[in-house]
From Swiss-Prot:
One of the primary rRNA binding proteins, it binds directly to 16S rRNA where it nucleates assembly of the body of the 30S subunit. GO terms for molecular function: rRNA binding; structural constituent of ribosome. SUPFAM superfamilies: Alpha-L RNA-binding motif. InterPro entries: Ribosomal_uS4, Ribosomal_uS4_bac-type, Ribosomal_uS4_N, S4_RNA-bd, S4_RNA-bd_sf. This is Small ribosomal subunit protein uS4. Keywords: Ribonucleoprotein, Ribosomal protein, RNA-binding, rRNA-binding. NCBIfam families: PRK05327.1, rpsD_bact. Pfam families: Ribosomal_S4 (PF00163), S4 (PF01479). The gene is rpsD. It comes from the Bacteria.
């Protein structure tokens, strides 16, 4: 599966936040935006603001690809209910993001690697597709051998269970977590490392799908 391989620190500096949860915060060394002397950008147009919100959302979930963004919007735009809530849920409930939220990996990118390399089980069966969509009641666990990975053990050891959103449960001892319910939009937005206007993203995509 295709994935983003570009410079991640530049993206964090662009948005002024350590959005990827790296232990070495790139903003400590270079707190200004990328570009010569962190030059100030010109005032953005409405299109530019929409584009920025879209880029922020993609970054929050581990550099989601454009085609994945468009596909998710097409899947929900004609359904009954809140389009913005269902759209955001498509990314919040991705397997790689749930692995990260549950604390099996320190960063979203480490979570993507765990899934892609076959370390993760869903309801006891191996799933190596990062974009796999979890539904309420589905359990996420790790293979027996994978539980011995130092990176996994360190990540779980440092995971504060009180920081878990209410729609997720975690059993550290058994290396198992569960998606308990469909999250509300405000709950999902609270988990994002920087604020994103989801309605603006959906408006942007509505003109391009």
């Amino acid at each position: 599966m295709a994935r983003y391989c570009g410079p991640k620190n530049r993206i964090a500096r662009r948005f002024g936040a350590n959005i990827f949860g790296r232990s070495r915060n790139p903003l400590l060394k270079k707190p200004h935006p990328p570009g010569q002397h962190g030059m100030q950008r010109k005032k953005k147009s409405d299109y530019g603001l929409q584009l920025e919100e879209k880029q922020k959302l993609k970054a929050c979930y581990g550099m989601i690809l454009e085609k994945q963004l468009v596909k998710a919007f097409k899947e929900v735009v004609h359904k009954q209910g809140s389009v913005t809530k269902m759209f955001l849920e498509r990314f919040e409930c991705r397997l790689d993001n749930m692995v990260y939220r549950m604390g099996f990996a320190k960063t979203i990118f480490a979570a993507q690697q765990l899934v892609a390399h076959g370390h993760v089980l869903v309801n006891g069966k191996k799933v190596d597709r990062r974009s796999f969509f979890l539904r309420p009641g589905m359990q996420v666990s790790l293979k027996e051998k994978s539980r011995k990975l130092q990176s996994v053990q360190e990540s779980l050891e440092n995971k504060d269970e009180s920081s878990l959103p209410s729609y997720i449960s975690l059993d550290k001892g058994n290396f198992k977590g569960e998606l308990l319910m469909s999250p509300e939009q405000d709950q999902m937005e609270a988990q994002l490392p920087l604020p994103v206007d989801i309605s603006v993203v959906c408006e942007f995509l509505s003109h391009r799908t």
